[in-house]
Each structure stands twice: as C-alpha cells, then as structure tokens.
C-alpha cells in the first residue's frame, strides 16, 4: 500500500488541476428515498427523479456511490447501516446482507477502487469498511482524528463526505479525501484521510484547506475518473443545497449552481455517461440506448458485457466500436453475399447465350447459324468468386470465397433463336466482420435462359431461383468480454435479367456495345443466435430488392491456330443500382437483463455506382467440344470481387 500512497501523493497536483466536466451527470438523494439526476453544468434542472423502492419502511438513504468494479450499479447505505444495490434508472433497490452498523447519520460513503471495499465515515467520528458483495462489516478502523502535527490537531472532526480518487476497476493507487463540516460553525474543511506514509485505515486526517463554504451535515462528495471533484453543500440558514467544484490542492469550493427546489439533498454520485451517448452513429446510439435499459443489478455475463464497455473509456472510439460489435451490423451484408450464386449465373449464362449466337466457323469459313451449329447444346463450368465489401459507417468489412459448378442444356428451334435451362450449386465461406469465424452459405439454383437476334441486334434473357442455407458466426471481443454467437437460417432469391446490344464483325475483330438490366428479390429469414451469452440477438427477416443496370462493350478477336479456332475477348462496363434504399433490420437482445425491446438498425448500403472488367479465352475445333476460360471483376471503393471460371460446351 505504501507505494500506492506515494504514487497518489505525487499525482495529487495533477488530479486537482482538472476542470469540472460541464456535461457530467450527477445524482443525489432528496426526501431520503428519491434519487434525483441533474447535469453538473445545470444542477437546477432535474433530468429525472425516481422513487427508490425495496428499502425497509421508515429508513432513509444517506450515502451513495457507484462501484468501480461494477460502475453501472449504484450502491447506497441507509440510516441504519443497511447496504443496498440500486438500479439507478428504475430505482429498484436490493438489500445486500444485513446492516453493517447501528444507526448512523452525516454519512461519507465511497468505494476504495484498489481493494473493492466501501469506506463509511460519519459525523460521530466512525470509520469502517464494508464488503460490497455481502454488506458485512469488514473492520472498524480508528476513530477519525486530525494528526498531532496538523494545524487542526485540536479540532474534533465532523466528517460527512468522503471520496476516493481514480475510481476505476483495478486501480493500483488512490487517495481518500474527506469533508469536515466543522459542525456548521465555520466553513467546511477538505482533508485527506491518511497520506503517503500513514494508512487511511488509521483514521488520521491531514488538512488540505478550507472550502470557504459553511454547510450542515447534508453533504455529498464524489470524484470522477478524470479527477473532477464535486460536492453538495447545504446552507445552514436557507437550507438550500448547491453543487460546487472542489480544488483538491487547495480545498477551495467554487459554486456551480443551486439544486432544484428547496429540499435538502444528501449524498452525491457522479454517474458514467449513458451508453447511448457513446455511439458515434445513430445505430450505435440505438444499441447503447437498449443497454441503458438494463434491468435489476447486472450480474454474470450481463455485468461482464456492461463492465467491458465501461472499461474502454480511456481509448477514443473504443466504446463506439464495442457498441458496433453488439449490433446486427455484421449481418447487414447478408443480402449482398446471398447474391453470389446470382452473379455467377448471370455472368455464365449471358456469356453462353452470346456463344450460341454463331461462334462456330463452318468448313467453308462462314459463320454458323444456330441451326447449323447443332440443335441441342450442353455446357458445364466450374469456378470461384472471391473478394470483399469494404467497411463503411456501420457496415464492417466482409470477405467471402465462393466455389461453384453449374451447367445447362439448350434447344435451338430456329436459326436465330434458342432457349435453355440451367442449374448449379454454390458454396461460400464468408467472414462477416474482421476477426470472426467463417460463416457458410450453401446455395442451390436453377433457371431458364434464351437468346434471339435479327441482323446485328440481339436480346438475351434469363431468370432464376436460388435457395439459401446460411450457417452464421460472428465474433465479439472487447474489454474482457467475448462471445461467438452462431445461428442457422434460410432464404431465397428470385432474379431475372436481359441484355441487348449490337454485334459487329470486322474481319475477325468483333465489337459489341450492350446494355443489361437485372432484378433480384432477396429474402434472408429471421433467426435467433445461440451461444452469444449476454450479447445474443434475435434478428428479423431481411428483404432487399435490387434493380441494376449494366452498360458497356465487348471487343474480341478470333483467329485460326492450326486446326483450332481461338477467340479472345475483353470487356468493360459500368453498373448502376437503381434501388439503393437503406434497409432496416429489426433486432433485439435475447438477454432479459438488457431488455428485449426490439430496436431498428439501419444498414449502410454499398455505393450504387461501380464497374466491371473481364476477359474470355475460347478454343474450339471441328468437333462438338469447345473450351472456355473467363475472368470477371467488379470494383469500386466499396467492393472488390473477382470471378474465375473454366468450362466446356458441347453441340450436337
């Protein structure tokens, strides 16, 4: 302990120089049973007033403080020495053990953050410590007395306020300050209990200086994490209680303002910022507001979650990031990831439809018609699609690796017209947020396609249905709290599209400007997470409609190499998403300790404008078999996706 006291003494001047926080929320007791909340910068305006329930009839609350090890739980002591744990939002009090002391008044009540014990001092010079988990008396310490060498050595202390510095969980150093009212006969005195060489457990007081304010025994006193010291003093004549800032170096008190009404106030606790106020976005604030609604006194995983957020206070942005992890933001990319199979289908089907429009050279060197090329055709391709969606606002970075196989069968019933069917399977591994384990999507899909042309003009069209089977995993880790919720859900995608353009041939060189449109209707079913402890969510159904235009051109060249025809094609285009509204995800915590009221999360959409580029290599001989290899990329600042495919087609 001596090293801790030396550290505390050396840092005193620094702590005392910190100005009061103008937006700090503070709480005090009036009428003995009502918890009043005000803003430290405007103490005359009551933010909330809550009746404390659950305390024994005829008793009153005299001292309050937040426990550093569980900083959202307000602890209190009554005039008969009973310790209570209170939910400050609801006012519901839970008795902790049995009374630790007989009748007491003029109470100083504060937590020692280094040992997680409650210090209680009184105007009758009592000085004792209480175990917060049981309410039991830990030990009676020495009678409060000024040090023999102190300027006030002969004074009889009337201590009615106590506060420790550095009130954070796991603190390794702290200093105990007390306020001596001097029986309201002179301005109150600020003192330390103990110093660098004397333990506070001896009850020895050392004068810091006069507050300059005379007060009766209704005193409140607390020190914030950043060293701001606040006190409530009550004028002996007017009985008006006012809020003051206190200089821990000189003892001088500076008036901030009168507390509301003409009632007496007793006790003071500086509350932490609300979780909602920690959010940097509306979605984070919504998550925080739900956590602010926690019920009862947090215990177990609920306490670990809440304490984990609070422990991040010293790192800018860390609390907002924790709220993001607790949101359904990791699931906001599910509709886009669910379109993997559709993207693969569209790319391959439209490419094959183009091949159907006369890519076989006859023996005399002329281009074959559909009918010349064979009335029945089949194709089979396999490949992979991989990439990521970038992080933006409330959307975390999501990566995925997909493999697929699909094939089709078509019938050419006119020289310029063909129809066909296709189907396939897609398997996707996805990380929904950085650090999370892999989620898996299995998709079965099938559809129809067709092509028709008149002269250089053509129209290709397709439609498909995709069944979705998701095994979901996300990871949560912050401030000592961690969880890995999992879930299973399904869904489906209806999609259809068409492409039209003009195809020109210039002696082996081909140019094809085109325009395409695709509509997709995605549904990901509602689900409830498992294994998420206090952070598990119920997530509502997600629906998304997409109407996308694609405008671009293809340039190709084909040449005879030995007995084979080799075709090389390059393409580029611009995508425009016309239905880009931000979807709402309705979600709720499963943990009743956090409240299960649904709240809305507004997903951050991907940019509506992006680009694509690709290339195809095709090789065919005089027989029915042709081989193709294709690469396609979609990109902008929000996404980077590549698709690689190899396959074969057969004409009969």
Residue ranges and their predicted role:
Residues 25-29, 73-76, 117-121, 171, ...:
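Conserved beta-propeller blade signature
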Residues 57-66, 101-113, 147-167, 214-220, ...:
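Repeated scaffold domains used in trafficking and secretory/extracellular systems
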Residues 419, 537-652:
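Outer membrane beta-barrel transmembrane domains
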């Amino acid at each position: 302990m001596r090293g801790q006291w030396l550290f505390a003494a050396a840092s005193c001047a620094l702590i005392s120089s910190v100005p009061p926080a103008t937006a700090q929320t503070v709480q005090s007791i009036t009428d003995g049973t009502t918890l009043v909340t005000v803003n430290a910068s405007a103490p005359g305006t009551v933010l909330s007033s809550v009746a404390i329930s659950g305390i024994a009839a005829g008793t009153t609350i005299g001292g309050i403080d937040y426990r550093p090890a569980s900083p959202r739980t307000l602890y209190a002591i009554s005039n008969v020495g009973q310790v209570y744990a209170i939910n400050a939002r609801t006012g519901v009090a839970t008795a902790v053990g049995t009374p630790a002391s007989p009748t007491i008044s003029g109470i100083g009540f504060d937590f020692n953050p280094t040992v997680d014990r409650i210090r209680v001092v009184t105007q009758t010079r009592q000085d004792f410590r209480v175990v917060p988990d049981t309410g039991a008396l830990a030990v009676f310490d020495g009678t409060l007395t000024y040090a023999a060498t102190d300027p006030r050595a002969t004074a009889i202390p009337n201590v009615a306020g106590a506060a420790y510095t550095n009130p954070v969980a796991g603190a390794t150093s702290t200093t105990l300050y007390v306020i001596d009212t001097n029986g309201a006969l002179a301005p109150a005195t600020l003192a330390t209990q103990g110093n660098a060489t004397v333990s506070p457990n001896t009850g020895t007081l050392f004068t810091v200086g006069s507050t300059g304010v005379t007060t009766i025994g209704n005193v409140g006193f607390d020190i914030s994490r950043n060293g701001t010291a606040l006190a409530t003093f009550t004028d002996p004549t007017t009985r008006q209680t006012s809020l003051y800032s206190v200089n821990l170096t000189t003892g001088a008190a500076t008036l901030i303002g009168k507390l509301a009404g003409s009632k007496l106030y007793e006790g003071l606790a500086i509350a932490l910022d609300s979780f909602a106020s920690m959010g940097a976005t509306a979605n984070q604030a919504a998550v925080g507001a739900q956590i602010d609604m926690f019920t009862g006194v947090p215990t177990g995983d609920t306490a670990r979650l809440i304490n984990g957020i609070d422990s991040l206070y010293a790192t800018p942005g860390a609390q907002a990031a924790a709220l993001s992890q607790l949101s359904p933001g990791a699931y906001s990319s599910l509709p886009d990831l669910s379109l993997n199979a559709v993207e693969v289908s569209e790319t391959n089907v439209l490419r094959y439809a183009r091949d159907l429009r006369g890519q076989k050279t006859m023996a005399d060197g002329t281009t074959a018609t559909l009918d010349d090329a064979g009335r029945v055709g089949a194709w089979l391709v396999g490949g992979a699609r991989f990439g990521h969606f970038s992080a933006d606002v409330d959307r975390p970075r999501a990566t995925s690796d997909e493999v697929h196989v699909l094939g089709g069968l078509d019938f050419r019933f006119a020289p310029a017209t063909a129809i066909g069917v296709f189907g396939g399977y897609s398997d996707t591994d996805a990380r929904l947020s950085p650090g999370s384990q892999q989620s898996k999507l299995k998709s079965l899909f099938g559809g129809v396609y067709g092509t028709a042309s008149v002269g250089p003009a053509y129209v290709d069209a397709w439609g498909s249905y995709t069944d979705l089977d998701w095994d979901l995993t996300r990871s949560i880790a912050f401030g000592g709290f961690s969880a890995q919720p999992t879930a299973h859900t399904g869904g489906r995608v209806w999609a259809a599209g068409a492409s039209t353009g003009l195809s020109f041939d210039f002696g082996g060189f081909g140019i094809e400007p085109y325009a395409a449109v695709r509509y997709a209707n995605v549904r990901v079913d509602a689900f409830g997470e498992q294994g998420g402890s206090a952070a598990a969510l119920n997530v509502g159904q997600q629906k998304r409609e997409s109407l996308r235009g694609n405008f671009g051109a293809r340039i190709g060249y084909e040449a005879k190499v030995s007995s084979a025809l080799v075709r090389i094609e390059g393409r580029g285009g611009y995508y425009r998403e016309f239905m880009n509204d931000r979807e709402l995800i309705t979600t709720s915590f499963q943990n009743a300790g956090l409240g299960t009221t649904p709240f809305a999360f507004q997903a951050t959409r991907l940019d509506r404008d992006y680009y694509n580029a690709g290339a195809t290599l095709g090789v065919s001989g005089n027989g029915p078999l042709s081989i193709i290899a294709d690469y396609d990329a979609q990109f902008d600042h929000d996404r980077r996706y590549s698709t690689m495919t190899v396959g074969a087609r057969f004409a009969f």
